């Protein structure tokens, strides 16, 4: 049974937790993370959700909810490792964006890792496939409805900044 800590919209801890699946009171939030893994060639790692999950079959970046007692960065490191087997340190995460929605403080991170697909250890309960794609291909996939809404929104809101980050990775 997982519990999530609750916060105000300004991230002040409320000192309360809620069980996964329970309604979150209006004006209260829990932390959700997304991690976009980019390799030194500028390719983005996508994982495909298993068919039986919400948005089954859609492609996404690693992510999930911070459990009680976890910081956003700790959750990002844990989710990336659980879903792909990729190890990252908190200080390797580049904070890219935060989106506040109905009940979520959704933190988006970028991490640079060169990991061949053959070295990934996919969490079979959540992920059924993985692939490296260019930013242009990711845009195409989002337009065709092949990505989760979260990825599509990230591209829509922050695509230019992601392009700059990728150029920085490739050329620096």
Model-derived segments and their meaning:
Residues 28-30, 92, 125:
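Short solvent-exposed loop/turn micro-motifs enriched in small/polar/acidic residues
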Residues 10, 39-42, 50, 112-117, ...:
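Short loop segments at secondary-structure junctions
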Residues 6, 37, 46, 110-111, ...:
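Conserved hydrophobic "DFG−1" position in protein kinase catalytic cores
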Residues 1-34, 40:
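Acidic, metal-coordinating catalytic segment for phosphate/diphosphate chemistry
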Residues 45-46, 61-94:
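The catalytic Nudix box helix
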Residues 4, 28, 43-44, 58, ...:
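A residue-level structural signature of the nucleotidyltransferase/glycosyltransferase Rossmann-like core
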Residues 18-21, 56-57, 68, 95, ...:
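Nudix hydrolase/Nudix homology domain
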Residues 32-63:
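A glycine-rich, hydrophobic loop/mini-helix early in the fold
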């Amino acid at each position: 049974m997982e519990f999530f800590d609750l916060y105000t919209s300004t991230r002040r801890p409320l000192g309360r937790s809620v069980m996964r699946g329970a309604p979150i009171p209006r004006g209260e939030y829990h932390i959700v993370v997304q991690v976009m893994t980019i390799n030194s060639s500028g390719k983005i790692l996508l994982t495909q959700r298993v068919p039986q999950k919400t948005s089954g079959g859609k492609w996404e970046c690693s992510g999930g909810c911070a459990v009680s007692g976890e910081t956003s960065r700790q959750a990002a490191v844990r989710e990336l490792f659980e879903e792909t087997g990729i190890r990252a340190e908190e200080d390797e995460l580049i904070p890219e964006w935060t989106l506040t929605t109905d009940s979520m403080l959704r933190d988006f991170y970028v991490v640079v890792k060169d990991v061949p697909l053959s070295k990934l250890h996919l969490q079979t309960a959540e992920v059924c496939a993985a692939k490296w794609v260019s930013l242009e291909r990711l845009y195409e996939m989002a337009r065709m409805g092949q990505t989760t809404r979260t990825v599509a929104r990230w591209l829509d809101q922050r695509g230019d900044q992601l392009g700059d980050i990728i150029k920085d990775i490739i050329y620096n």
